[in-house]
Regions:
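WD40-repeat beta-propeller superdomains and closely related acidic/aromatic-rich repeat-like regions
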Residues: 1-126
């Protein structure tokens, strides 16, 4: 069992290698490393930039980039290390609650949808 996240996890996402697990709850994202013997006894990475509950998490198909969306419409792209620690490499804003996020297969574009039915795409610098 893992513990240490600040609030009840509301969303979960593994990266494509299965070595990182991101959990979203409240405004903070917690990232656990499954390298070596797994996350028990390790200190997870904590990512903070949202001012509202995190509503969506999605890892890029390639590499260790994570996209997150929140109820206030904020979106962040995170660059992560293999231990789950990292930082924001870009942010954007939608007009309403982020309800979905998806990466293009080449990991260079993300699309996000919101509660008003709008869909927006962004190119992600590599």
């Amino acid at each position: 069992m893992m513990s240490g996240y600040p609030g009840k996890p509301r969303n979960l996402a593994f990266n494509s290698s299965g070595k990182l697990l991101a959990t979203g709850g409240y405004e903070i994202i917690t990232v656990w490393s499954f390298e070596n013997n797994g996350p028990e006894g390790t200190t997870p990475g904590q990512l903070e930039c949202h001012e509202s509950f995190v509503s969506m998490l999605s890892f890029a198909p390639h590499g260790n980039r994570l996209a997150s969306g929140a109820r206030d419409g904020s979106i962040a792209i995170w660059g992560l290390m293999s231990d789950g620690h990292g930082g924001s490499i870009g942010t954007s804003q939608m007009s309403d609650h982020v309800s979905s996020i998806a990466w293009k297969k080449d990991s260079k574009v993300i699309a996000a949808g919101n509660a008003k039915g709008q869909i927006v795409t962004w190119k992600v610098k590599t």
